[in-house]
Design a protein with these regions (language model features):
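A glycine-rich, hydrophobic loop/mini-helix early in the fold
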Residues: 1-24
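Long beta-strand-rich cores associated with HINT superfamily self-processing modules
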Residues: 17, 30-139
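Intrinsically disordered, low-complexity acidic/polar and Pro/Ser/Thr-rich regulatory regions
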Residues: 135-156
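Short aromatic/hydrophobic contact patches that present stacked aromatics
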Residues: 25-29
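Surface-exposed peri-terminal alpha-helical interaction modules
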Residues: 7, 23, 33-36, 74-77, ...
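A structural signal for alpha-helix termini and helix-coil/disorder junctions
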Residues: 6, 45, 109, 141, ...
Length: 156
């Protein structure tokens, strides 16, 4: 309802279906960054899934440091007497991205935090996001070395 009020729209089924893209959503947490894109590709290859919008916050992180791949897709939902399209938000991220986003949300949106302090801590939060991204890349590199059989000597 907040989103409808903010957009000054009536509280009707039509207004919701036409203007609210995240009435339904799912978060997919993957082990590795490359898995995110593989999962997205598999989803979008389904003949009953239509891509409406794609926001790649992995390749283009938010200023806060937030990383995730967001897809708005349209999928069929089956009601008692009909099949209707529904917009669904799909968020795909790694375990590290999910860890950071969960903790950042808890810290940033706590009540009674001084705005000035929060602004100063934002630099630390972005630094943590960057370190988290480095960890993702390092773990993916290790996985690829294992897959190629190059786990010998000083390869690490």
């Amino acid at each position: 309802m907040k989103k409808l009020r903010k957009k000054e729209l009536p509280f009707t089924t039509d207004a919701i279906e036409e203007n609210i893209t995240d009435i339904a959503g799912i978060r997919v947490v993957c082990s590795f960054e490359e898995d995110i894109y593989k999962m997205a590709d598999c989803l979008l290859q389904q003949d009953d899934v239509t891509l409406i919008e794609r926001k790649d916050y992995i390749k283009h992180p938010k200023e806060s440091g937030y990383r995730s791949l967001h897809l708005i897709v349209e999928v069929p939902i089956f009601l008692e007497n009909e099949k209707r399209p529904m917009k669904v938000e799909v968020q795909l991220r790694t375990i590290a991205m999910d860890f950071w986003a969960s903790l950042e949300h808890k810290l940033r949106y706590k009540k009674n935090i001084d705005a000035e302090l929060l602004e100063k801590l934002s630099v630390d939060l972005v630094d943590c996001a960057n370190k988290s991204a480095e960890l993702d890349k390092k773990m993916e590199s290790i996985k690829k070395k294992i897959e190629r059989g190059k786990v010998i000597g000083d390869d690490f």
